[in-house]
Amino acid sequence: MEGIENIESKDFDIAEQLNLRIKLLGITEIIDNKLFERVHPCLVKNNTYIANVGGVMNAVILDGKPVGESVLQGEGAGPGPTSSALMSDLLSVLRGNIKYPFGIASNKRNKSAIYDVNNYVNSLYMRFEVKDKSGVLSQITKQLAKYKISIQRLIQIPDNIKKKASIIIITHNVR
């Protein structure tokens, strides 16, 4: 699990410039018949449903075959809604009302293989705060090339007063 404590206001501003939003997402999926679960900040396109869920509202997007995508939305942020939802969910699991509380039948949960997070493939957002001088970008891209990391988007934002720059890189999918 990774929270938003390392995200700075500058990252939100940069995301907005890129027509993206930063959202804390919980992701559960079955990959190669193994359970993958993760909570972490994600960049999502501004025009997606999840990007526009805000305030005390939370949403769950279920995507399955052959039904496609379904969205469940309701209050879930803030002390009242969060504690109420948490207690309700815990009681439902304890009473056995939820047959698949973690995406897999309860009686098979212990037998489930867990997908190795180190094998997960996704794109990455990187922000480097550097001195604004020649050769710095070249050093960064050489290191990325060394590890076969391909750049999808690159932006350099100069700070002429401090003689520094922010270099923002969004990669293609990497492992």
Predicted region positions:
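Helix-enriched interaction subdomains in cytosolic or periplasmic regions
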Residues: 63-64, 69, 73, 78-100
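Hydrophobic alpha-helical bundle architecture
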Residues: 50, 72-77, 129-133
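A conserved regulatory-domain signal marking ACT and ACT-like small-molecule sensing domains
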Residues: 85, 90-175
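A generic structural motif
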Residues: 27-29, 63-65, 129
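Conserved active-site and cofactor/substrate-binding residues in soluble primary-metabolism enzymes
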Residues: 2-10, 57, 77, 81-88, ...
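Substrate-binding/catalytic subdomain of NAD(P)-dependent oxidoreductase enzymes
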Residues: 1-52, 57-59
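A generic structural signal for well-ordered coil/turn residues at beta-strand boundaries
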Residues: 33, 56-58, 66, 122-124, ...
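Low-complexity, glycine/alanine/valine/leucine- and proline-rich hydrophobic stretches
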Residues: 40-65, 76-80, 145, 151-162
